[in-house]
A protein has these predicted regions:
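Auxiliary alpha/beta "docking" domains used to position bulky ligands
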Residues: 1-148
Length: 148
């Protein structure tokens, strides 16, 4: 199943795919807790909310067994010129990357259900997030072998 998911992710257009065991990020939770208690988050009070969900995907989506992480490069050759404020490259597109990635994830999910059946993929699989859940995304990318 792992190889199928990774291969289908690439065929769907993602640049990479990794899979990590869903479990509490205990070291990250301890660090984040002390970081928050020290006030390092300044005015970003939203970081205080959903603490357990941020550090444990099973709390966010019960019965989760794995976290599938996909990467999509949004680099563009387009250079900004002149004395103007810089805009992040992900914002150069006329299409919102959230919409693009969500659509690609739906195709990937459909391929998995088609191959393995809906009874193998429980309803918790259908939870796809694109910057829309309180997850430590970089840590999950690292755990899935896609980051450092």
């Amino acid at each position: 199943m792992t190889n199928f998911i990774k291969q289908k992710a690439l065929e769907t257009g993602f640049d990479a795919c990794g899979i990590a065991k869903a479990e509490a990020l205990e070291d990250d939770a301890a660090f984040m807790k002390s970081w928050l208690e020290a006030g390092m988050h300044a005015d970003m009070h939203y970081l205080e909310r959903n603490f357990e969900k941020r550090t444990n995907p099973v709390v966010l989506v019960p019965e989760t067994k794995s976290v599938v992480v996909v990467l999509l490069n949004y680099y563009t050759e387009k250079e900004q010129t002149g004395d103007v404020p810089r805009i992040a490259r992900y914002a150069h597109s006329k299409i919102d990357y959230h919409t693009v990635i969500k659509s690609m994830l739906a195709k990937l999910e459909s391929a998995i259900v088609e191959k393995f059946g809906s009874d193998i993929i429980n309803s918790s699989f259908q939870h796809s997030f694109v910057d829309s859940a309180p997850l430590l995304e970089r840590r999950w990318a690292q755990r899935a072998g896609l980051g450092w």
